[in-house]
Structures are given as structure tokens and as C-alpha cells.
Amino acid sequence: MPAGLTEPAGAAAPVVSSASGAVTMAPVAALPVRVEGTPVALGPVTKAPVSVCVESVAPQPLPAPVGTLVTKVVPVTALPKLGSPRLPAPQIVTVKTPGTTTIQLPANLQLPPGTVLIKSNSGQLMLVSPQQAVTGAKTTSNITPRPAVPANTQTVKICTVPNSSSQLMKKVTVAPVKNLTQIGTTVATTASSTSSGQPVALPSSVITVTPAKLVNTVSTLKSSSLGVLSTPSNDARLKAETSVAAQTALPPTVLENVKKCKNFLSMLIKLACSGSQSPEMGQNVKRLVEQLLDAEIEAEEFTRKLYIELKSAPQPHLVPFLKKSVVALRQLLPNSQSFIENCVKEVSGDVVISSCTMTTATSPVVTSTVSPVLVSGATAPRTLSVQQTLNPLAGPGVANTGVVTLHSVAPAAATGGTTAATVLLQTSKPLTTSVPNTVAAVSLQPENPVVSGAAVTLAIPSATFGEASATPLCLPSAKPAITSAGTKADKPAIGTPVQIVTQPSTLLPQAAGIPQTAKVKQLVVQQPSGSSVNHVTSISHSSPLSTQNCGQKTPVNAVMPTSSIIKQITLPGNKLLSLQAQRSSIQSNKIKENGPTCFRGEDDINDVTFMAEVNLDEENACILAAHSDFVGTLIQSCKEEPFLVIGALQKRILDIGKKHDITELNSDAVNLISHATQERLRGLLEKLTTIAQHRMTIYKGSENYILSTDTRSQLKFLEKLDQLEKQRKDLEEREMLLKAAKSRSNKEDPEQLRLKQKAKELQQLELAQIQYRDANLTALAAIGPRKKRPLESGNESFKDNPSTSGTSSLTATKPFRPRITRICLRDLIFCMEQEREMKYSRALYLALLK
């Protein structure tokens, strides 16, 4: 809009301007607004000052513990023209809010130009007339707050102080977010412009006060937040304002669908750009999302290409979901490229500063978002100061101040000038220490001055000397930053007191001449309501850390805590077992980050020892150390029985000992000889058993052996050939005899007579064999079926007597008999040949003779 102010939804009452210059408005949520317009006198002044006062009468409790106060200041700009001066147009103030009610004026009522119609709290209509201003003089409209505002409130004061033009100042007083936990926060933003009459653009400032409950917090600073600010352009600012306006106009159901769709696309890009996927897949998925957000392709085409790229099964509910939410998402995300870059940055790198475990009640988190000022031709510093004052706590030491300063510096997009944006976060609270005047300061220079998420907890080294000293801990960026000193709080506010107890830690490098002493540091965050506190003890050491951001490595010098655990275990016998383990927080966080989609949590759930909090190494050490003293202390034994008869053995030993003058024999010697004999026989039997098993082993069916020569089969084949040859000869001889017997020759040949006689004998022999076979068959038939042997009665009894098959199957089972290994003399000879002591003995010679 060319002139005037635009209030966000919910911050002021809706105002609707008519064509005649009248302004009609109605109160929303009991929030009255008074708008005064002041015309400008003739002269080179190009801006018309307008003063708007928005005041809240009663605190408004919100359903959620998050309160967001958005204040936008758009100064009135006009181009200077040469020529006759003329009066400016009446100022138009427009606030677009759903459900606006207008004031209907009578038809005969005409408002003079420049007057404003305002409805008061009591329902009366008031006309406000403008006041003339002197040409070239500075005009400032001051509005004092009403006394109905409560004391514990949040005040945002935004002042635009030009050098030689008008001044625009607005005070906004809003009720606290939560009545129980009220934090007085004062935010002052001051911007100075040049007197050259060139346009000055002031971007919006967003201040978010979020009380959150932190349990087991891991504080993480993104790598994108370390570096230098980039100056946004006017187009980006306009797109951002358009998206905010579109978001306020959408219904809650559509906003919920848009949020789900945005999370779906963000998770899709993160999974595609993770380390386990190929780079081509990540590029293709990002291109598809960009085309979908830019309306180059529709939801059907997007899902079809996405299924092909990810090689996944079609999802029937995805296309209706995208059709329902992608149109509104395009309105809220006018720049799809920045959305994709933010998703990729979240995947690319997280610089974990430190991780601490805290159990606290509701604690405030102040998040400030500041964008730089665009100034042409001059330097325009801009400071955003956030001060938080907490109730002092009683302690033995002097109340000191801990200052946390966040600096953000970036060059402005202007010619011949730079812009510095400084954010100062001051927390005034007592530190219970034995040495007074100790200040602990932390300075951060982020690339994007957006501090979001949970509270940032850093291991801050402190130094104590007897006098005032400061120990800054800096995370420098690639470009120099402007350091500003801490400011003093205006009013003490009623809030949740927080006590931070710090003990002296290792000293940072100090100036020469100052004594340095190594200290131990312990940080305790404590709530006065009696909640449980976990102590986090760490030995800090400085270690260089390099982070990669858009192809540029930025060194970060931070204090990384290394946790050291020393546990002593008392063992039996007054022994102490010390276990020491050191682990850096960076290593533990790398394990969590570098895992495949990070799924160490599932392994911990499946690990029974982890869930039961059992340390296996410690348990093993205790078991080994506990039982080491009992080894060998208790001896269990039984009385030995002699293998040989003691009387016969002793007599035999004495008979042999007479040759060596041995007349007496100890009982231990007899037992030893008996035991030695037993062991010798046991060894021989084991060897003989092995040899016999090898002898009976059939290697033919084994897969480890291949048959090379089979002599037995060859011999059987030759025997079979001999039998066939013999049968052939017998058959030829028989045929010859039969021919001779049938011949009827009258010659008295003796050879012929011999053949005839032999043929008759052969025939008689065959006839006798046939008769013998028939007699055997007749006798077997008369005797009946022979009785089956018990070993073979299991299966054959079924065929002979089917009626008794049920009982015979139970009684015919073979009893279990232990396998007996039979050892023959050949095995003994082979064993004696293999032993060196018996290879040349007389026993082997006698065995060979047998």
C-alpha cells in the first residue's frame, strides 16, 4: 500500500476505509485502536507522519504456551516532484481481518476531507481533525499508554528515527502469553535513514517468546546458522508478506493439510538426499518437487514419475491428498527453490555443540528473528536488544550477571555503505560463587539470525581471580562481527527464577601477569519449585571443529565436553577394580548421525542387556575376579582301586627285585605300577579299536574316495568266464554222447561202445537228480511252512498270518545291543609294528609265527 500501516491479524481492530476518506472500524477481542492522521505543510517534506496506538486492556490467555508477536513497519514513501506544492492525499489505514463489521453512516452526513471517524470503547462515535505542521520541521506524534494495562506485560517498541524527515513510532502493548509464567521482555528496534529522500525499506521483525519444558535436551546448531547474513531482496520480502497474508486467509483444516503436505515433501527430499541413496535420485526428486510447487506438473504426473524414480508401489490416497493441499501450499511457498535448499541443508550437516541432560520445569526460550536494513548511500545500524530479568536468589556470594550476546552482521545491498544488525540477549541473574564480580559471556555470530528450537546449553568455562574478569567464548564467523556491550534491564519482571551454580573451571588464555589456576567446573540448572536436578559434570577442552556449508569450510572453536566415567567395584578379599571410560560428545553424536537413517534406537530396544541396564564387561570382570581366589582351594577326590591284585603284583615285583638287591617295597610303588599298567593297557586298547574300525570301514560308498582299481571285481569276472567256458564244453560233450547213443551202426567199434555206455550213465544220473528234486519238494510240502527265525519275523509274519500282525509288530522289534568291535591278531601285529618299543620285540616275532 502506498501509505499507512498494516496491522497483522489479531493485533488490532479491523479498519475499513471508504472512498471519501472516512475510516470505519470495529473492536475485535476488546482491543481498541485510535488512529490520528496529521497532514503535512507545504514544503519538500515527502512523508506524512501517522501515529497509531494499539493498546490491550485485559490479558488474553492463549491455549498453547507459545506466543508470537509480529510487528511490521512500512514507512510512507513518496517520490519528490518538482513544481508547485500540493496537499497530500488523506491517509488510509486498512486492516484486513475476517469477520469485519462496518459502521453505517447516514446518507445526509458528509465528512470533511482529512477527518477520521473513530468508535470509542463506550460505543460513541468521535471525529478527529488533523493539525497543521510547520514546513521543514520534525513532526512526532507521541501516544501515552492507558493505565488499564497490567504491570506484567510485554512491550515492543519500534522507532524509526530519520535524520531530516518525519518520525514514525508505534507502541504495541500485548498481554502476557501465560499468567502463571510471565516474563517481562522489552524489545527495542531503532533504524536510522539518510536525509537524501531516497526510499528506505524496513523489513519485519518477529519476536517469539516460547516457554517450553526441556527434558533430556540435545542442543544443536545447524551449520546454516554459522556464517554471514545474506541481504534479502524486495521481491523476497514481498513474497514473504504475500505468503503470510495467504496463511491468515486459509481455514484451519486447509492449513493442517498444507502442513502435512509440506512435511511429506520435506521428508521425501531428506530421504532421497541421504547417504544411502544415489545422487541422481536426490536430484530427480528435488526437480519433481520443484516442478510440483511451481505448477509445472500436476499431482498425477508427479506421483507417476515419483513411483518410477523410487521404484515403489502406487499409493491410492496420495493423489487426492496432493490435489487437496498442493494449491494452498503453492500460495504459502512462493519460492520453491529456497524450500528445497532448506530441506537439503537440514540433511547435509548438524554441528552438535554439546548435549546435557536437564530436568527442569517450564523454562522460557526467547527466539528473535531479525532481518537486515536496506539503506542506500549510508551506514544504518540496527540493534535488537532482548533483556530478560529474573528474580534474584539468595546465596553466599554476590549477585553477578551472565551475559549471552548473539551478534549477526551482514553487508547491506546498497552503494557506499554497510549495515550492521546486532542482537543482544541479556539475562540478569545471580551466580552463586565465592568470588564476586565474575561475568561469563558467550558470543555467537550466526549466518541466519534465527535461534529456534530448544534452549542452547554450552559448557562455559569461567575464571575466578579476586577481581572483575571476563571469559568470552566465541564462535567466530567468516566475516568480522560488531560486539556490543550488555544493556541494563528497565524493569524487573515477575517470572520463574532460575539458579545457575557455577564453579571455577579451566582457564582460558589470559593476559600476562595474572595467576592462572586449573579449576573444576560444574553446571547445575535448578528450579526453585523443588524439581529434580541432574548434575552434568564435564572436563572441557578446546578442540577445533570445521563445518561445511555450501562448499565453504568455516572453522569453529568451541568447548566440547568429554565425559569421563570412573567406577570402582569392591571385590572379595578387599580388592578394588577401577573401570574408566571416556567418550566425547562429538563421537557419540556422530554415531547417531552417521547411522543408516539412524536406527540405533531399534537395536537398543531389541538388546535385552541394554534395556536391563546391565554392563556385560563389568559383570564379566566381577565374575572372573570373584572366582579367581577359589580356584584350587577345594580338592575333591575318591579312593583309588588298584587295577591288579596287590599280593600277586608285590610278589612278582620282589622276585624281579632280588636280582637288583631289592628286599622291601613301598605300597605307593605297588599302586604306581598298577596304575601304570592300567594306563598302558588302556592306550593299547584304544589304538587297537581305532585300527579295527579302520579295517572295517567301507571306503567304496564314501564321497571322499574315488575307485581307481577293483581287483576283486576283475577276479570275479575271470571266474565267471571260466565257468561259462566249462559249461560250454560240458554241453558239447553231452551232445556228442547223445549222438553216439542214438547211432545204430553194426560195427563192433570199442570207442563207439564206450561212448554209448557213457551216454547211458549220464542219462541215468540226470534222471536220478530229477527224482531227488521231486522227492524234496514233496517232503517240504508234507512238512508244511518252516518256522521263521525271530530276527526275521517282523515283516514276514504279516504275509503268513495277517490276523496276528498287530501283536507281532510290537514283539518283533529288535532289542538294542551295544556295538562290539572285534579285534583280531592282524590288528595287534599292525599295532606292534607301529610302536617303536615293540617293533623289534620277541612278542611280535611270536605273534608272526602264529
UniProtKB/Swiss-Prot annotation:
GO terms for cellular component: cytoplasm; nucleus; transcription factor TFIID complex; transcription regulator complex. Residues 99-240 are annotated as: Sufficient for interaction with ZNF628. SMART domains: TAFH (SM00549). Residues 504-526 are annotated as: Required for interaction with P65/RELA. TFIID is composed of TATA binding protein (TBP) and a number of TBP-associated factors (TAFs). Heterodimerizes with TAF12/TFII20 via the C-terminal H2A-like histone-fold domain. This heterodimer forms a histone-like octamer with the TAF6/TAFII70-TAF9/TAFII31 heterodimer. Interacts with P65/RELA homodimers and P65/RELA-REL heterodimers. Interaction with POU2AF1, via its C-terminal activation domain, is required for octamer-dependent transcription. Interacts with ZNF628. Residues 794-812 have a biased composition (Polar residues). Gene3D superfamilies: Histone, subunit A (1.10.20.10), TAFH/NHR1 domain (1.20.120.1110). Belongs to the TAF4 family. CDD domains: HFD_TAF4. Residues 256-353 form the TAFH domain. The modification Phosphoserine is found at S584. Cell type-specific subunit of the general transcription factor TFIID that may function as a gene-selective coactivator in certain cells. TFIID is a multimeric protein complex that plays a central role in mediating promoter responses to various activators asond repressors. TAF4B is a transcriptional coactivator of the p65/RELA NF-kappa-B subunit. Involved in the activation of a subset of antiapoptotic genes including TNFAIP3. Through interaction with OCBA/POU2AF1, acts as a coactivator of B-cell-specific transcription. Plays a role in spermiogenesis and oogenesis. The keyword Membrane does not apply. One of its GO terms (molecular function) is protein heterodimerization activity. The keyword Transcription regulation applies. A motif (Nuclear export signal) lies at residues 509-549. One of its GO terms (biological process) is mRNA transcription by RNA polymerase II. Keywords: Coiled coil, Cytoplasm, Differentiation, Nucleus, Oogenesis, Phosphoprotein, Spermatogenesis, Transcription, Transcription regulation. Residues 788-812 are annotated as: Disordered. InterPro entries: Histone-fold, TAF4, TAF4_C, TAFH/NHR1_dom_sf, TAFH_NHR1. Highly expressed in the testes and ovary, whereas lower levels are detected in most other tissues. PANTHER family: TRANSCRIPTION INITIATION FACTOR TFIID SUBUNIT 4, TRANSCRIPTION INITIATION FACTOR TFIID SUBUNIT 4B. Disruption phenotype: Deficient female mice are infertile due to a granulosa cell defect preventing normal follicle formation. Deficient male are fertile when young, but subsequently exhibit an age-dependent progressive loss of germ cells and misregulation of several genes required for normal spermatogenesis. It comes from Mus musculus (Mouse). Coiled coil: none annotated. Residues 642-691 form the Histone-fold domain. This is Transcription initiation factor TFIID subunit 4B.
